[in-house]
From Swiss-Prot:
Family affiliation: Belongs to the AB hydrolase superfamily. MetX family.
Catalytic activity entry: L-homoserine + acetyl-CoA = O-acetyl-L-homoserine + CoA
Active site location: S150 (nucleophile), D311, H344
Enzyme Commission number(s): 2.3.1.31
Gene: metXA
Name of the protein: Homoserine O-acetyltransferase
Entry's localization field: Cytoplasm
Any matching Pfam family: Abhydrolase_1
Length: 369
């Protein structure tokens, strides 16, 4: 059952946030949505962390006119995996993004102009520190769980290591403790596509650059899929409207990348795309520690990991490595490898497969106290 119509909320914090870079950001606005009701002892709160280009609109619709529900609608609502009859679910837009939270497209109160490239470089850890301010605002001392895939999984890891006393569990899907050189190189090529678009104007554009961002998003879509899913979805089919020997004729997979790339331009700010890509590349759970083992020694809550066989962006061995280290430290951890052809996007699509395991995990967490 759907959660129905949901209104986005926002809160502005006048306090300044000291970032990992040493720079100061403030005031900070966070956009967020909530689903369900917070119980009397405030023990049923779940934070869902979104991925790179996601937003706070996790489930339901913001108006009757919306044609699509939130990005993970299938798992949120009465009787669903995140049962809103039992849980209070929160999803906030990360700082650096462009869906209502403070980012490069926001107005710098000191200048009265958009930040653009004067916006400071942010990290996933900075995002989580801002989320902690939101929990304080909502009067929530401790989360039942924090759950997320991809960059959302990185946020879950940061909660587990940086705020170990504020969570009872963490669930991380299709994620990594640090992106590989291959993942960084793909983001680098996406950046070049934007940097070489003359309409980007070194971040001082008035109208969102079109071609550079569309190409960058197309590169991203390739990493979200897999060889098997591309065969299943497109094969070698040629666009029926194009002639086979038309020089500019397209295979269906080309048309898909073009369509999704240019649609993305209408919904996402280019500078935000660049800043969040940088945050992904910089991510390292062990940042500030001698090793990943030292970082994970701070973990107190059980962590449940999910990896997907065809995910080549953050392949399963990277998740398994984290689970192995946590196990060696005597930390409560689960690692599940799910057979899937969907590639990195499997964390959004395989919910029927992982839902029973998540339910069992959360039931154990709730019974533990």
């Amino acid at each position: 059952m759907s959660v129905g119509i949901v209104q986005e909320q926002s809160v502005t914090f006048d306090t300044e946030l000291r970032l990992e870079s040493g720079r100061i950001l403030g005031p900070i606005t966070l956009a967020y949505e909530t689903y369900g009701e917070l119980n009397a002892d405030r023990s049923n709160a779940i934070l869902v962390a979104h991925a790179w280009t996601g937003n706070a609109h996790l489930a339901g619709k913001n108006s009757e006119e919306d044609t699509k529900p939130g990005w993970w609608d299938a798992i949120v609502g009465p009787g669903r995996l995140l049962d809103t009859d039992r849980c209070f679910v929160i999803c906030s837009n990360v700082i650096g993004s462009c869906y209502g939270s403070t980012g490069p497209a926001s107005i710098n109160p000191k200048t009265g102009k958009r930040y653009n490239l004067t916006f400071p470089v942010i990290t996933v850890r900075d995002m989580v520190r801002a989320q902690a301010l939101l929990l304080d605002h909502l009067g929530i001392d401790r989360l039942l769980t924090v759950l997320g895939g991809s960059m959302g999984g990185m946020q879950a890891l940061e909660w587990a290591t940086q705020f170990p006393d504020r969570i009872r569990s963490a669930i991380a899907l299709a994620t990594t403790s640090r992106p590989s050189p291959q993942a960084i190189s793909l983001n680098a090529v996406a950046r070049w596509a934007i940097f070489n678009d003359p309409t980007w104007k070194k971040g001082e554009y008035r109208k969102n650059p079109k071609d550079g961002l569309a190409l960058a998003r197309g590169i991203g879509h390739i990493t979200f899929l897999s060889d098997e899913s591309m065969w299943q979805k497109f094969g070698r089919r040629f666009n029926a409207r194009d002639g086979l020997f038309d020089f500019f004729g397209q295979f269906e997979v080309e048309r898909y990348l073009s369509y999704n790339g240019y649609n993305f331009v209408d919904r996402f700010d280019t500078n935000s795309f660049l800043y969040l890509a940088k945050a992904l590349d910089l991510y390292d759970t062990a940042w500030g520690y001698e090793s990943l083992e030292e970082a994970f020694s701070r973990v107190k809550a059980p962590i449940q990991f999910f990896a997907f066989t065809s995910d080549w962006l953050y392949p399963p061995y990277q998740t398994e490595e984290m689970a192995t280290i946590l196990r060696s430290l005597g930390k409560p951890v689960e690692y599940h490898l799910i057979e899937s052809a969907y590639g990195h996007d499997a964390f959004l699509l395989e919910h029927e497969t992982f839902a029973p395991m998540v339910r069992e995990f959360l039931d154990k967490v709730e019974r533990s106290e």
